[in-house]
Amino acid sequence: MKIDGNTFICRFNVAILDDGYYLPMDKYLFVYHDQLEYIGQLNPNIIDQAYAALNEEQIEEYNELTTQNGKVNYLLAYDAKVFRKGGVSQHTVYTITPEIASDVNEFVFDIEITLPQEKSGVIATSAHWLHKQGHKASFESRSFLFKAIFNITKLLHIKRSKTILFTSDSRPNLSGNFKYVYDELLRQKVDFDYDIKTVFKENITDRRKWRDKFRLPYLLGKADYIFVDDFHPLIYTVRFRPSQEIIQVWHAVGAFKTVGFSRTGKKGGPFIDSLNHRSYTKAYVSSETDIPFYAEAFGIREENVVPTGVPRTDVLFDEAYATQIKQEMEDELPIIKGKKVILFAPTFRGNGHGTAHYPFFKIDFERLARYCEKHNAVVLFKMHPFVKNRLNISREHRQYFIDVSDHREVNDILFVTDLLISDYSSLIYEYAVFKKPMIFYAFDLEDYITTRDFYEPFESFVPGKIVQSFDALMDALDNEDYEVEKVVPFLDKHFKYQDGRSSERLVKDLFRR
């Protein structure tokens, strides 16, 4: 490698990079180690030169591309190196393509390998077929049993059973919106008239407890009121009695990232004939502005979306609780006493629970630590529960950083937070209640819009400064450039009520009390 100022020229042999073997298929960053780590960036001159070499037809193709990364990658593709076996093979090919990786918005080498598909033997093919058929038969038998229990129970409870059910496939206990609704049911003495039941599962990929395999369909068929707070696939496979209320108290506040039918046509989104979400008879939201978005997302009528406020935000308006929790948080996290507290709480990257991660290399921890030292600050990292790759805080940084990802209730952390750094997390709604500054570190904004998208334009919607590089993030911190004037209008738009009585309104609306 040769380095001249801010430019470098690098030459390497892909055939021996992986401990004497060829570099396997993946995307690779360029990282230069010199006490600190520096991520290699693409020289803009290369792009200018590549564009200048295009002919008229290529310029037309280039102009048809809608994203900046797409345009850059179109130009970089001409520098791809393709190695074919024997020089002509179509089946054994090793390709190295320079590109801007859209998921992290960084310059990488994308290596792809094409190899001839091995023919499976008769025994292996038969074993695979039998395994697949066995899995299918198991699923069908479990589905039949579930629906049979549900339908029998439903027939036995044509009249009201005086039962309320809280159920989730992504929550281990009575927490979040469920907890506040439950407490309000007790306060209004609804439990005097109804038997309250719960069936939970920690996440959607876990196996259900053996007992709950029977309890869930039984209670779904019996209950008069069924509360859910997330995607719950089993309830979409059955047909409820007309008298049953299926109530969605969605776990996130506001309408930020698209969900449900708003993602039709995108990866992971349902198709228009899907039964997902359509079972809900009521959905409760924070403001009238959310109504059309949630109706679209769930495939339900707008009159079934009710803006009573979100139950778990009630605590944010409770001054007595604020005093109590601040003291509890200082006792639990003594590192924050007398410090400026920055909460770094991004959402996950990936397509869902199984692939969720966060690219920690997008954070220059040494530089952030120096900021903390200079400004008497600490950073609390609260990663999304789905994120599999854990944050590794070095010994020398432990006086500045702490990982609070295992702290279940993020709302408690907000009470001691002076500045929020996030990206596309709906946590911004709750934090807006405190009328404090936010920075949006959206390094992959273009890709996120393409793959996930938002209900409103991100740039004009979010209540704070948007930065798309770590340098810009540090500049905003150093200059206290937060665009905090956006917070109060955002709060007033998305919180119809700011009185801490959302749970009360919801229960009164359902039970006419």
UniProtKB/Swiss-Prot annotation:
Protein family membership: Belongs to the CDP-glycerol glycerophosphotransferase family.
Any single Gene Ontology cellular-component annotation: plasma membrane
Pathway(s) this gene product operates in, as recorded in its UniProt entry: Cell wall biogenesis; poly(ribitol phosphate) teichoic acid biosynthesis
Protein name: Teichoic acid ribitol-phosphate polymerase TarK
Gene3D superfamilies in alphabetical order: 3.40.50.11820, 3.40.50.12580
Function text: Can catalyze the polymerization of the main chain of the major teichoic acid by sequential transfer of ribitol phosphate units from CDP-ribitol to the second glycerol phosphate attached to the disaccharide linkage unit.
Superkingdom assignment: Bacteria
Native organism: Staphylococcus aureus (strain NCTC 8325 / PS 47)
